[in-house]
């Protein structure tokens, strides 16, 4: 229930070419939520459902049942498809849109031992984790950054990702070259929101156009696998979706 958050029964219905979830709470009555605006697409994605793969190890116990518990409890029927490791709270930007509230002075860097423990836990849970993403804050400013990557690559992780705003990659070519040494099965998950200064100022608090261009130029030169990651805000930069996709398709990396 959107009012009391009680777990209630629901059903999926097709109506006016859209897909809705109808819910009824004994206390707060009926509610209706749009979950897809394309019925054929909704039907098609259900073809990609696959049997669950449970984790090898659980980390918490079940107290209240889903969705009220937090953590990898025995109620989980699916393993971690992608695990995010937040190695630091700190960042070299102060983005107004940041859900973590990161900044140059907020929080702390996790110690290398803490991070190793986090990575070891993932391996215990998964044996061979599919994807692990090194994130933050801004992970490239961590004083033990390359030691973190070295340790992660020593583990049976199938694919490693680096979530970054690209500032370090743009400003330090030798740093970027060193990243290339972690390929294959290594990817840059690069923040890229807009081509417009006004949008970047609102989302990131800085004009990062030249930084982004230089970062992509360096990554193209190295042919280092890169995914552009867009924070979309309705009415602000959603008109740029097509332009960003076209730009991405033109890049070597």
Task: Tell me what each language-model feature is.
Residues 5-16:
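Short recognition patches in nucleic-acid-associated and regulatory proteins
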Residues 116-133, 142-252:
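Radical SAM/AdoMet-radical enzyme domain recognition
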